[in-house]
Amino acid sequence: MLERIGISLEDGLLEQFDKLIAEKGYVNRSEAVRDLIRDALVQRAFTESSGREERVAVVTLVYDHDSSSLAQKLAHIQHENHRAVVSALHVHMDAHNCLEVLVLRGRGKDVVAMGESLVATKGVKYGKLVPATAGHDLR
């Protein structure tokens, strides 16, 4: 069941929003607003959980594989937390740089700790932990 709501926006904000949703390919404002709300709910659930609930996240890493034992350190962290690693994708971007994308799933505090550990590993050029969802609580 859908409920209709109304919102008020400052001058120019609606114009910017319409441009954004057109660029992203949304067919209407409603679907774009629903996606914004879903994203906010996922973020809140991830950050406000007790840490015991199951959570899903994606970690993106870019690093120089020639960097002194960095690849081994990253692999070690993954092996220490192997139950949380659902999937790992490793891409050779060029002769030196690697892109690694990991899907993590487990207790929230464990997922966050592992993701932050990977991102903070010395030598990682870019790292990001992005909360995701298994979709159970979303409509």
Swiss-Prot record:
Its cofactor is Ni(2+). Ni(2+) binds at residues 79, 90, 92, 98. InterPro entries: Acetolactate_synth/TF_NikR_C, ACT-like_dom_sf, Arc_rbn_hlx_hlx, CopG, CopG/NikR_regulator, Ni_resp_reg_NikR, Ribbon_hlx_hlx, TF_NikR_Ni-bd_C. Gene3D superfamilies: ACT-like. Chain A, domain 2, Met repressor-like. Coiled coil: none annotated. It holds the Pfam family NikR_C. Disulfide bonds: none annotated. SUPFAM superfamilies: ACT-like (SSF55021), Ribbon-helix-helix (SSF47598). One of its GO terms (molecular function) is DNA-binding transcription factor activity. Binds 1 nickel ion per subunit. Keywords: DNA-binding, Metal-binding, Nickel, Transcription, Transcription regulation. GO terms for biological process: response to nickel cation. It comes from the Bacteria. Belongs to the transcriptional regulatory CopG/NikR family. PANTHER family: NICKEL-RESPONSIVE REGULATOR (PTHR34719:SF2). Transcriptional regulator. This is Putative nickel-responsive regulator.
